[in-house]
Amino acid sequence: MLAAVALVLAITTAAPLAQHTRLFKPEDLSELEASDRDEWQQPGKIMDILRIGEASVVADLGAGSGWFTIRLANRVGPNGRVYAEDVQKPMIQAIKVRVDRLGLKNVETIFGTDVDPRLPRPVDAVLMVDAYHEAEKPVALLTNVAKSLKPEGRIGIVDFKKDGGGPGPAMEERVDPEAVIRDVQAAGLVLRSRETFLKYQYMLVFEKPRP
């Protein structure tokens, strides 16, 4: 991970990015690697709820440092596929370093846009962790995400509660789950569950209906 952080800092210093106030700053990448994150993030339970298993094809949107990407890669195994998408090139470079170092062959990085993750094939599930509050045009983004989901494919959106404290963005940047639900339903997906097991975050699970 230190190599990935060093690479991000080098790239950021050499070629400053255009300012985007809602995006996570690449120079703060190490904050995504908190030593207690497994405890409060509960990645295994999140993946279970989304029915992610051996040979699943999944997308990690706003993948950041790749913290969740590597856990997804280990879960889906060599016959599965993980698309690690981000809209910031330093994040993509950091993930590539990390994946190469770990020898993971089932991860593909994708440089997406604010409104299109550019997923190359239909996926079983999409995971968007701590990234929804950064979306500038969430309905447009979710509409394209929905196109990439298989029928009955699932999207899990995990983000910080407005009253949850803990790590995460400033309170004024956090998004009420009811607003997320309205956005996702406007993109044609159906709410399947609201999960409350996380300490600092909420989890919303949506599904793409069959035609």
Residue spans of the language-model regions?
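Class I SAM-dependent methyltransferase SAM/SAH-binding core
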Residues: A59, A63-P117
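A short glycine-rich, Lys/Arg-flanked "PGG" loop and its adjoining helix->strand segment in the class I
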Residues: A73-N74, V139-R154
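Short glycine-dipeptide loop
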Residues: E54-A55, P78-G80, L149-I155
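Hydrophobic beta-strand segment of the Class I
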Residues: V58, V126-L127
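Class I SAM-dependent transferase core
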Residues: L17-A59, S65-F68, A94-V97
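Conserved class I S-adenosyl-L-methionine
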Residues: I92, R154-I181
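Core SAM-dependent methyltransferase catalytic element
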Residues: R192-P211
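A short acidic, Gly/Pro-enriched loop at the edge of an enzyme's catalytic core
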Residues: P117-V126
